[in-house]
Swiss-Prot record:
Active site, per annotation: 73 (proton donor/acceptor), 183 (proton donor/acceptor)
InterPro entries tied to this protein: Asp/Glu/hydantoin_racemase, Asp/Glu_race, Asp/Glu_racemase_AS_1, Asp/Glu_racemase_AS_2, Glu_race
Gene: murI
Pathway assigned in UniProt: Cell wall biogenesis; peptidoglycan biosynthesis
Protein name per Swiss-Prot or TrEMBL: Glutamate racemase
A Gene Ontology molecular function term of the record: glutamate racemase activity
Residues annotated to bind substrate: 9-10, 41-42, 74-75, 184-185
PANTHER family referenced in this protein's UniProt entry, alphabetically: GLUTAMATE RACEMASE
Amino acid sequence: MSQPILVFDSGIGGLSVLAEIRKLLPHHNYCYLFDNARLPYGELEEQELISGCVALIDQVVERTHAAIVVVACNTASTVVLPALRATLSIPVVGVVPAIKPAAQLSKSKRIGLLATPGTVKRHYTYELISQFADDCHVELFGSSELVLMAEQKIATGQLDMARLAQVLSPIVEADLDVLVLGCTHFPMLRDELQQVLGKGVTLLDSGEAIAKRVKTLLAETKSEQQVQEDANRDSVMQAFYTKAEISEGLASMLVDCGFSTLERITTINSNR
């Protein structure tokens, strides 16, 4: 098996990023690693987040011989990337909230960032706003509940729209024309978010930009012959999780997505 692309997240949100990468690289092999034992990441202390993520990703990279790692989690990307890059010898791609394109797209210059509490409070987020949206009024909204709602939707096919409307009410009242989805779970709720917020609010995420970056990096590290060989073989997809068990609904969804292997990875702090 050729070296896979390893996509990592705390839960199923990173599947939205993996889907964008597969559009550009449909024949590549993929590993999806989700640390659902510690979900949601937005409520973890910084050092706990760093040490756990680095140990887990390093373990799976060594096992799968991954060619590249995509940290498809905004919360983890804001704090884990330096330590991860210092540990691994392969390229590591993180997620950056789409603040810059949001500022460029906004006509009212009133934009919002919807993310986890962890991402909202990071200094990195404020640096992005200062650098790319200095001419905009930017509202920040942090929610861990939306992460769990996205997980529930995928696992059960159900979503409490009344509760979603309550969670989003501060955003509705903020009178924005562009909202950045600063958590990879949130594109899973795109249709429902749009329904509550209305067509006057444009929703932006970073999935497409990440996919283009991954394709560029792989092209730099592979020969033309290797690229051609990848294009001529069927894609193999493996999923790894850290919780003791996953629901039948989630397992069924992963199989429907094309994953041929679902396996629990035992690591520190994974007994929840």
